[in-house]
Amino acid sequence: MKLNSDIKILGKNIILVPYRNYHVPKYHEWMKSEELQKLTASEPLSLEQEYEMQKSWREDEDKCTFIILDKNKYGQCGDEIESMIGDTNIFIDKESSTGEIEIMIADQQARGKKQGWESVILMLLYGIKHIKLKTYEAKISLENVISIKMFEKLDFKEKSRSEVFGEVTLEKEVSDEWLQWLEILTYLLR
């Protein structure tokens, strides 16, 4: 998405940066993991296909993605590649003003440190304020209990469940109260 092509979002513990072609090799290495493929319902891609996917994320107006950097690590080394820990995405349906949000903390050492929590909150706020989303959905593998619980803590409710596909769809309608609550959460993270 060109809207976020020059945006850098600073959090307390993370930085969200646009997905650029120089991020692709590390991202490609992550996606070779069978665990990540299973948790994200992804198929392995060749490196060339991954570059095409990155280009699509950059150019398509119905997709928004950021690479998640560990802010402390980036502060020490100044290297985005070395600091990468995951990504967060929104698939946008402009007609209904709905965004399907995704989060992946690929770096196992970064898991359990609330960096995914902080990333999702910042991405939700970005979608509300800049893309003007009115509703969010999260489609999550039934095996990814941690992610399901995180979205439930963000007040997402179950919309549907597919045993065939092994996933649950959670939904949250944006309200002024929820927006204020998200802003308070970001303030408390600082």
Model-found features: residue ranges?
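Acyl-donor (CoA/ACP) binding surface of acyl/acetyltransferases
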Residues: 1-25, 29-30, 72-190
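A short gly/proline-enriched turn/hairpin at secondary-structure junctions
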Residues: 36-44
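A general structural signal for well-ordered secondary-structure junctions
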Residues: 36-37, 63, 157
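Long, contiguous hydrophobic alpha-helical segments, chiefly transmembrane helices and signal peptides
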Residues: 40, 50, 57, 103-105, ...
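Active-site rim helix/loop that mediates acceptor-substrate recognition in acyltransferases
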Residues: 43-65, 70-77
